[in-house]
Each structure stands twice: as C-alpha cells, then as structure tokens.
Amino acid sequence: KYGQRKNARRGWGDVGKNLVLIGCGGALYVLVELCYRGRSHGSMFLLGGVCFWLIGLLDEVFPNAPLGVQMALGAWGIVCMEFLTGLVVNRWLRLGVWDYSAQPHNLLGQVCLPFAAWWAVLAGAAVILDDLLRFALFGEAFALPRLF
C-alpha cells in the first residue's frame, strides 16, 4: 500500500485531494457532534477535517504501523489539536464551544482523559475511512491495516 498513493488517478492534485479529505472529515465530525451533543460549531468542521487529514497521513509516515499504534498516534494528535484550538476558540475568543472543566483529568477545561479514549476509537475509524475514501474517490490502493 505504501508508495502506491501517488498519481493513482489523474485529475486530482494533492491540494484537491487534501481539501476533499478535510471536507469529508469535517462533515463527518460535525455529524458525530450533532448525534452526541445535538449541536456543533463551524470551528469543529475545520478541526475535525484537519484531524481526519492528519490521521490519514499516518500511513505515509508510518507505513507498517498496526492499527493500535495509528489509533494511539491519532488520539494524541487530536488531543494536541483540540487543546490548541480550545485555547484560541474558547479561551482567547471566548466562544464557549466546549468546556471539559467538569470532566476528570482535564487540562484548562480544553482536553480531558475520558474524551482522549474516545478520540482513539474515532481515530481507528478515521484510519480505515481515509483509506476507503482514497480508494473510492482517487483510485488509490486499499488494504485493511494490520491489527498487531
């Protein structure tokens, strides 16, 4: 699978592919939030999309990493991005998009340990969904990630 992503189907430049993947990831994350919280925010579309795209790049950086490793790395990336976005959106701009202050093991109310576990689950789904989208939309190789 590694190395087979380049130029699989002509017509999509790297920027176009990235924007499509960010858009798909952002839309899916907003849908997850709407199902879970009943509301979302425009900043979550951007954050969810960028996190989805970054998780998709794990195959490029760690081509032989098992799914569990990709899930852990994806969760770590999401937590970092969520913390930085929270500092800007919630603390600096005071938009109040989310507040984990009441959750155990939180950091400034922007991230918390219980949600980090859920991010690992979502990251696992994102790893597989990214490969499926790349296969369906761009004709790239598809193989399920190995578990161990």
Regions found by a protein language model. Give the residues of each.
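Aromatic-rich, lipid-facing transmembrane alpha helices and their immediate juxtamembrane interface loops
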Residues: 3-148
